[in-house]
Amino acid sequence: MTDEEASTWDIVRNPKFADRIFIKDSARDVYSQLILKVKEQEVADGKVTMDQLMNFTSDADIAAVEEYMKEVKPLVAGWEADFGKDQMVQELGYVNLTWSGDGVWAIDEAAELGVDLRYALPKEGFTVWFDGWVIPKYAQNVKAASYWINFMSRPDIVIRNVEETGYVSVSGAPEVRDAFTDEEYDPIDLSYFFTPADTAVCANPVLYPDKADIERSTQEHDWGENTTKLIEMWSRVKGDNANAFTYILIGLFVLAIAAFAFFARASKARRKKSRRRK
């Protein structure tokens, strides 16, 4: 696979990688990426921003993404929530629409096996996301929850958490920056994350993307009243993703059952005939 092939969302409908593509089984994640692809010309023409696209859930928008996904579906080896990274490490998959933390894990695991995996951020744009600790309005132990959040925000704990999960924290503490500075990587602009002076930090770009990449990103939004329509579209797209081999297995299974039933019936008939002779 070339860097050029991996630089665009069109990679997920590239027949060169048929049956080696794994897509997240997540309607929101997939739709939010592909609406950026489908509407890329409108973004380029300045008619709409990527942030605005995250609210594009009209019938026409949904139909456009569905049409694109119909081209993707025949090439998909699996819709996954967790096993895609393993397929990549084992070289059973060549393309995986995945989360950055899973990407970090897969790249590290593959390197130990001599497999070169890379993480790409498509030129059409992509979404960034975050999970956050919150204290519910009616929480009964606010003090304990506050202690927990403060604990998880400590620089030393942040470092351990990133090392364990592959996902970064929002903490831009100097200790965190220093812990993940590695001369193995080329300098990148992380002034948006740490301090304005951090314009050339040697860090893993999968963990901390360059500022220029972040400027091509946006955030997903809740679909509101259109959620049902989008989920229905997702169900139509996924539908039956069985490939030819799957149908062969199903056919053989059905034949085996039919053969078993036939021989069982024949055997029973022979036993009855034998008893009558006696």
Question: Where are the predicted features?
Answer:
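Solvent-exposed loop/turn segments at secondary-structure junctions
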Residues: 1-2, 19, 27-31, 101-104, ...
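Soluble non-cytosolic domains of exported or imported proteins
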Residues: 2-6, 25, 59-63, 82, ...
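Mature extracytoplasmic/periplasmic domains
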Residues: 136-213
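Conserved C-terminal helix/tail region of periplasmic/extracytoplasmic solute-binding proteins
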Residues: 201-278
